[in-house]
Each structure stands twice: as structure tokens, then as C-alpha cells.
């Protein structure tokens, strides 16, 4: 049965969620970051940070890099007792990947994250006319960052999917990386309120049997957890 489309988010609900999230993110201080419209919403980023802290995620892969990458590195840098973190941020744009890498180095957190430059190329899992990350570059980057261990948090915020005809650009993420996910892993899809991402979620659910908790109005993200360990859900936005 098809999942009905989400209603449009109430502007005030978004404002309240993001305002509360900004207060939480103030605990990750550092230099000013250029937060643009394409960045993950503050409420979505807090949902990701909650999963890392509450469920002890240590092997994180982020598709699409930027402000979220820098803030996640700040979080990991704050919490040395957790230890053993392996983080890969996959980016198709070489110039932007370099900016993120340099920003991490300026903040002294460059050792926390491996920036993987993987250009967008034709891919067998992509829709006709669309591209996904170069398989060889992605595999090599994940091999370096994960060192053969399974991913326990996958954040899908790339490649760009906002342009006309690009709504399904992020579909390959789950079928392409499913075999790399460990038991109990969390999958997060950003921009879950958009029609293209809603269709991606429907396909993922139909093909994998996963159920995505759609938090688009409050956080902008949809979240699912694979079978396995019983995670603590942690605080949620109301």
C-alpha cells in the first residue's frame, strides 16, 4: 500500500523545532559557518547528533558534506571517551570537498573525518538520466574510513536532488550501501518533505521492509533502523 504524501509543514512548527535545535547546537561552538538553504536543518542535525550520542554510533557515513560535517566533527571532538570514531563524508564537488576539509583542519578536527571525493557518474542503480557517486572512488574512500567495519549510521543528504528531474537522485543510497550497514544501523534521509524524497522513501520501504519514521514537519528528516540491537530512541522533537 502506498504511503500517503505528507501534508505541507506548518511554518510555526518548523520555526519552533529549528529554534530549539539552534540552542542545542550552541553546545558545539566554533567559528561562524555559512549556513545556506541547502544545508540540513538544525532540527535534523540535532536528530543525527542525538542518535550518535544516545546510541553510541561510531562508524558514520554522510552522503553530501558541509555544515553538518563540521558540526559532527565538533561533537566527536568533544566526546573522546566514546573513542573509535570512523567518519566518512562523501562529496561530489571537488571544490566544496576541499573547503570542508580546510575548515575541519582550521578547527583542529581534520583527523575526525575522511572527506571522500566521489564525482557523479552514470550508475546502474540511478534512474535514467541521473548519476550517483563513482563506485570505485566511493569504495576506496569507505575502505579507508571504515577499515572494513560496518556502517552504523548512514546520513543521506546528497547528491543534490532539488532540481527539476532530480527528485530521485538519492535513491541509490540504500540499495547501494545496504550490504555495508551493520545490525541495528540507522538510516537518515534529509529533505523528507519533498515529493522526490517521499517517493524514494516509498521505494526503500517496499524493497527493504524498513519503516521510516517521517519527521519531516519537525526536523526535515526521515529515520529508519535496521533489525539488530535494540537502540535507545533518545529525545525527540514534538
Show which residues each predicted segment covers.
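Rossmann-like AdoMet
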Residues: 1-39
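SAM cofactor-binding core of SAM-dependent methyltransferases
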Residues: 38-122
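C-terminal substrate-binding/active-site "lid" region of AdoMet-derived donor-dependent transferases
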Residues: 159-238
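Short, conserved loop/helix-junction motifs that constitute active-site signature segments
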Residues: 79-81, 147-148, 177-183
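Surface-exposed cleft-lining segments at the edges of enzyme active sites
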Residues: 33-37, 124-125, 160-165
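S-adenosyl-L-methionine
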Residues: 101-149
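Local beta-strand N-terminus motif with an aromatic residue
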Residues: 57, 150-152, 184
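Short SAM/SAH-binding signature in class I
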Residues: 146-158
